Amino acid sequence: MKGRIITDKGSMVVEFFDKDAPKTVQNFIGLAKQGFYNGLKFHRVIRGFVAQGGCPNGTGAGGPGYSIDCEVLGENQYHEKGVLSMAHAGKNTGGSQFFLVHDRAQTQHLDKKHTCFGKVTEGLDLVQQIE
């Protein structure tokens, strides 16, 4: 399954890991279809690490009003460049916030702790341009 993330820098095509993280993919797509992400900013950008978005109030403290369980046991649970992963404040506390990985070198410690649920397959250069 594929989707598109549209930013002010351009658009990216994402291939979702629906076998690894079916509930996370379903949650993300459901929020997107409801327009939840429309107009939201990437509120946390750390060069060489991640660009994080999905907070409705832009501070990193907001969410959809519920939490989903982590899904970290699949084959694609490695934070390499272009991976789309759930942000959370602890196990099973994610909801709407996600991040795009800039570089594998700085994100290995996130493997099997944050749910990887997709990867940018087109427009990968845009990940580095998000500010």
Predicted regions and their residues:
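Cyclophilin-like peptidyl-prolyl cis-trans isomerases
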Residues: 1-131
